[in-house]
Amino acid sequence: MRARLHLLDWLACVAGARATPVAAVARTAEPDILTRAALLGNVLEMDDVHRAALLHPGPVIWPSALSAARQEKCGMDTALDGAVRGYEAMIAVGTTFDAHHYAHFHPTSTAGGFGGVAAAASIFALDTEATGWALGNAASVTGGLWRMRHEDVMTKAMHAARAALEGLWLARLARAGLTGPVQALEGEQGLYAAMVEHPKAMELGPDWLIHAVSFKPWAACRHAHAAIDCAIELQAAGKLNLPVAVETYADAIRFCDRPHPVTELDAKFSIQHAVAVIADGRKAGPEDFTAQAIAALADKRAQVSVREAEEFTRVYPAHFGARVISGTAEMTLADTRGDPERPASPEMLGAKLRSLVQWGGLKPVEADRAHEIALHGTSIGPLLALLEDWLA
C-alpha cells in the first residue's frame, strides 16, 4: 500500500503540472505519454522527498517503472515491486553523498539514474550481473548541476526525466549484454572521486527505504516547509502576527533566503514568501506562488526575516526543522507534515490530489479515477489510459 500512495502522489503532481509551460514543451517534443509525464512530476515542487538523501524519488521512479511494465506487459504488482526497489537504490546511493556534493549537484539527478535502473531491472528480471552493469553505467553518465537554480529555466524538470529515461535505457541495454563498471562508485576515477569529498557508508536498514520518504503538502521547496508548518500552527492558535522571524538550518537559508522573488520558481524557493502566504490566510497551493501572488504579498513578505539556528543545522538532514517567532509567541517543529514523524493522513493526500486535479484544469471526477487506479488497480492499462487523457 505504501508504494500505491506514492504512485497516487506522483499522479497528483503530474495532474497539477499539465497546464504549465513545461507541459507544452512535453506535448510538442515527446510523442510518448510516459516521457511527457516524466517531465511533469517535479514541476510544482510538490513531489515526494527523502530528507537524508536530499532527493525526490517519485518523479524519477514512476516513469521508469511504468515504462518497463508497459514494455513487459506486466501487472500492477510487478510495477509496484519494481518501484519499491527503485526507491531503495536511489535513496541508498543518495545518502552516501556529502555536503560538498549537494553544494554543486542536484541529487535527484545524480542519484536518480540508479533508481531508474533498479526499477526497470527488477521488472525486466535482470540477474545480479546485468543489474550491476546497468548501475555502473548509471554512475558513469550521471550529472546535474545546480546552476539552473540561478536562472528562470526548466532544467530541473528535465533532470528528473533524464534520470528516469536513462535508467530505463541502461537496464534495457544491460539485458542485451552491454557491460558496465561495477566499481563505478568507489573505484579509481569513479563517481565518489569526481563528485564527493567524504562519501558516507551506505546504510540499508530492516525496512524498505520508501517508508522513510516524506510527502509534500505545499507547493514550495521542501526547505521552506517547516517554516510553513510553524506558521500554520501559530495561525490556528490566533498568534501569527507580522512581523515574524524564522529560524532554521543553514541549507534552508542557502537555498530559500529570497526576500525579493521575481519568478514563480523564486517564490517557491523563498521562505519569506512562503510564510507571507500563510500570514495572508492562503493555503500555500500552486496559485500562491504565481506572479500575481508575488506582487500581492510584497508588503507582508518584507515583514518576514530569516536566520540560521545551530540547533536545526546540527540535526539536518535527518530533520528539516524550523521556528517561527511572532511577538511573544513562537512555534518550533523538528519535523513537518508529511514526514514519517508527522505522517500524511489519507485525507491530506486526497485533498492534495483534488486540489492539483483542479489546478491542472481537469474535472473533479479525474481525482476519483486516479484514486481508484492508484490504490486498487491490478493492471497498468487504465493508468496509461488516464495519462493519455490528461496529457494528449
Spell out what each predicted region is.
Residues 14, 18, 72-75, 93, ...:
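Long alpha-helical scaffolds in large eukaryotic adaptor/regulatory proteins
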Residues 66-72, 119-127, 278:
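Alpha-helix C-terminal capping segments
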Residues 58-60, 109-113, 345-350:
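Short acidic alpha-helix initiation/capping motifs at coil-to-helix transition points
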Residues 45-100:
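Hydrophobic alpha-helical hairpins/lids featuring a short glycine-rich hinge
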Residues 59-66, 112-119, 164-168, 226:
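Well-ordered alpha-helical segments within folded domains of soluble proteins
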Residues 77, 85-163, 181-188:
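Glycine-rich, mobile lid/loop segments that gate access to catalytic sites or pores
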Residues 1-54, 155-165, 172-392:
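Terminal-appendage/accessory-domain detector
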